[in-house]
Amino acid sequence: LARSSITSWTLRVGTAAALGIDAAVHTHLAPAYDPVKATVSQGQLFRVEAGLAIVAGLLVLIRPRPSSWIAALLVSAGGLAAVLLYRYVDVGPLGPLPDMYENTWQVPGKLLSAYAEGAAVVLAGLGLLVHGGGTRARAKRRLS
């Protein structure tokens, strides 16, 4: 395999694995958080996060285009931002969202999910650089 092919596969598999861990943790925790609700329960939000992580991971594996890397980056960065925000800031309920403040890392899987989301942010960002670069150059070659 060519060096760029190995790099591509490493980034794709790594990003998908990190998003898979994120999805597994959120799926596992969702039932325990169903009682925490305003209009939407925290468990429902966890299931949405899990679904988005699965889709983004599959996109990166199956179709490693810039749009797939952007999706993976947005899902992982959004998840990481949410867990950090609600860990350190008591935001309270926001519209249909429940009060998700949880001043601890002791919840089983919470820290693992945060690490996985952080890894996915880095890997998806690198994937976007690797797979997103050169698009204009390829387009120019096709036009000439």
Locate predicted features:
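Membrane-interface extramembranous regions
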Residues: 1-144
